[in-house]
A protein has these predicted regions:
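Helical hydrophobic small-molecule/effector-binding pocket
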Residues: 71-97, 103-112
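Generic structural signal for hydrophobic core residues of well-folded globular domains
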Residues: 52, 56, 82, 86, ...
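Key DNA-contact positions within bacterial/archaeal DNA-binding proteins
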Residues: 36
Length: 186
């Protein structure tokens, strides 16, 4: 419980104040713990940032599980996975802090790029049967990351308040085309 409070406080600080504006002492104060406890759990600010950049529990497993959906329905499955994850308040808080921290911190951005490349693009590409599977996985991932930013981070209307079924119906076929449809212009 104490560790969770420390990480939550650090996520808030990194996403609001950046690397330079976050101190171990300020994180301890925000978490309501003695600064020695923060140093007990984390050897330094790098280790604290690493903990903050860990995806929500079950996130990576969910991406892998979505890949077992029959190919004809995988686009919609990936959209629903994203919507399910972001509509879980605890997961959304973690993801939002990761994205906001990565937006202005080169170290966090590099780690997020690695996570996306391995967990998202890699997991999607692994189950595709085509020579351009990594390119296709990148296209699908770009659409999903864009959806997350517009709907959940920036709350752009009308997308932010559109019923999830309508979002899945609109974006699922695009993801599906990226996964196994024609990529040439029509």
């Amino acid at each position: 419980v104490v560790l969770d409070r420390i990480v939550a406080a650090a996520r808030r600080s990194f996403s609001e104040n950046g690397w330079a504006g976050t101190s171990m002492r300020a994180v301890a104060h925000d978490a309501g713990v003695d600064p020695a406890l923060v140093h007990y759990y984390f050897s330094g600010k790098d280790a604290l940032l690493d903990a903050c950049l860990q995806p929500p529990e079950g996130f990576l497993e969910s991406i892998t599980a979505a890949q077992t959906t029959p190919m004809r329905a995988r686009g919609a499955a990936l959209v629903n996975l994203l919507l399910d994850t972001w509509e879980d308040p605890a997961a959304a808080q973690v993801l939002r802090s990761i994205l906001l921290t990565a937006a202005h911190e080169p170290v966090a951005r590099s780690r997020l790029e690695s996570l996306i490349a391995q967990a998202m693009v890699g997991a999607v590409a692994e189950r595709l049967d085509s020579d351009d599977r990594h390119y296709r996985a990148c296209l699908a991932s770009s659409q999903l990351v864009g959806l997350a930013f517009l709907r959940y981070v920036w709350c752009v209307e009308p997308l932010a308040s559109t019923a999830r079924e309508k979002v899945t119906a609109a974006i699922g076929p695009t993801i599906q085309r990226y996964l196994n449809g024609p990529l040439e212009p029509r």
